[in-house]
Regions:
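Cyclophilin-like peptidyl-prolyl cis-trans isomerases
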Residues: 2-225
Length: 225
C-alpha cells in the first residue's frame, strides 16, 4: 500500500536536511523519491513566471552521462519541462555532476544520482525549482525525472531514471503532485540495466547504495547546442 503524504504548500525558509531513504515498510516500490537538500540562501521565492525560459530551442538537447559502467544519452524535453531542463543544464554546464555517483539503486524501480560524491558527501546546490510534474509526461521506463523531498517544489540537482514504468510517481492532483519527468534515455538503456543490477548496501542513513560506486565521470551536452 502506497502511503500518501500531505505536502506543505510553501518552501521551508531555512536549511533542511532530509535523508535519501526508502520510507519504512514501503520496500522497492516506494512512491517517494527523496533527496537531501542543503541550501546556501535561506530566503528565496520560486516563481514560475520569472523562472520559465522565454524561448525554446527547436532541436532537443541531448546530454551524455559518461559513467564507470557505460554511457547514457538523455534527450531533454524543454517544451514540456522548461524550468526543469534549464535547471538540469545549469548543473551540466557547471560540471556539477562530474564525479558524483548513483547513490540509490533499486532494481525494477529506479536509479538515483546527481547529489553525492563517492564517499557519500552531499554537494551544495542552487535553490529549488517548481515541480513541473503536471506536464503530461509519465514516469515510464527510461524516462528521467527530478528527485525531491516531500515538499513538491523542492527539487534541486538530484534526478532518477525509471527502471520500469512507475505510474505511482505520476502527477495526480495537488495532494499527489508526482515527480517531474523532463526527458528520456535515447541511448544506453543497457547501461541503466547494468547499474540497476549492482549489489547494494546500507551506508550510514543511506539505503540501497552500490557497494562499488557507480560514478558519473562526466555530463556533457552532445547535441542541440
Amino acid at each position: 500500500m502506497i502511503r500518501r503524504l500531505l505536502f506543505v504548500p510553501l518552501l521551508v525558509p531555512f536549511l533542511i536536511i532530509i535523508a535519501a531513504v526508502v520510507l519504512p515498510g514501503m520496500g522497492a516500490e516506494a512512491s517517494e523519491i527523496r533527496q537531501v537538500a542543503v541550501f546556501q540562501k535561506p530566503n528565496f521565492v520560486v516563481s514560475e513566471e520569472t523562472e520559465r525560459p522565454k524561448q525554446m530551442d527547436a532541436k532537443p538537447k541531448k546530454v551524455k552521462l559518461e559513467t564507470t559502467m557505460g554511457d547514457i544519452v538523455i534527450e531533454l524535453d524543454e517544451k514540456a519541462a522548461p524550468v526543469t531542463v534549464k535547471n538540469f543544464l545549469t548543473y551540466v554546464e557547471e560540471s556539477f555532476f562530474d564525479g558524483t555517483i548513483f547513490h540509490r539503486v533499486i532494481p525494477n524501480f529506479m536509479i538515483q544520482g546527481g547529489g553525492f560524491t563517492p564517499d557519500m558527501v552531499q554537494k551544495r546546490t542552487h535553490p529549488p525549482i517548481i515541480n513541473e510534474a503536471n506536464n503530461g509526461l509519465k514516469n515510464n521506463r527510461g524516462t528521467i525525472a527530478m528527485a525531491r523531498t516531500p515538499q513538491p517544489d523542492s527539487a534541486t540537482s538530484q534526478f532518477f531514471i525509471n527502471h520500469k514504468d512507475n505510474p505511482n510517481l505520476n502527477y495526480v492532483d495537488a495532494r499527489n503532485p508526482g515527480y517531474a519527468v523532463f526527458g528520456k534515455v535515447v541511448e544506453g538503456m543497457e547501461t541503466v540495466d547494468k547499474i540497476a543490477a549492482v549489489k547494494t548496501t546500507q551506508k550510514g542513513p543511506h539505503a540501497n547504495v552500490p557497494v562499488e560506486p557507480v560514478v558519473i565521470k562526466s555530463a556533457k551536452v552532445v547535441s542541440g547546442k
